[in-house]
Amino acid sequence: MAIAKDAKDWTLDEQEAVAKDIAKNGTSSIAYAKAKAAMDAGTKFSMKLTNGKTLEYRIIGINHDDLADGSGMAGLTFEATNSALGSQRMNATDTNAGGWDKSELRTRLNSGDLWLLLPSELQSKVKPVTKTTDNVGGNGGGAPSATTDKVFLLSATEVYGDMQSDGIQYECYKSKGVTRSNYSG
């Protein structure tokens, strides 16, 4: 695999190839340095959704999430950086009662109307991962369990890192020293 161009110019096919190579070869991947530099710089990618809006996204993790099929790690994890999907509620009661596992938003993001906003070219490249999530919700304390997701919300721990909850802080946030006491959005 030869990735000569800057990460900001990677096509979806190249993003997928980079993710696969990093998953296979880790830091020895020929694309690792470019992916890490893109993550550290906050390089944004974009694509048109099926509703005509533009989704912007960036790399937040490298070899961070376990693939749900047990075959290894997802080479790259991405995060949306704009509100192309609009403001969404977790469930009909507009709370997190029931947690992520039972949420209306999880269904909508992984197989419903929000998933269908992603172009088929992207849908075919997204690999399900296993996430550790607090499925009690309602701010009632941690009871982490596993869910399988293609698209997911980040847990507080995945962003802040200094909480005893679900998941592990993503490298993008950790490298910037983000904690719950200093995060400004």
Residue ranges of model-derived segments:
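Collagenous Gly-X-Y triple-helix signature in extracellular proteins
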Residues: M1-G185
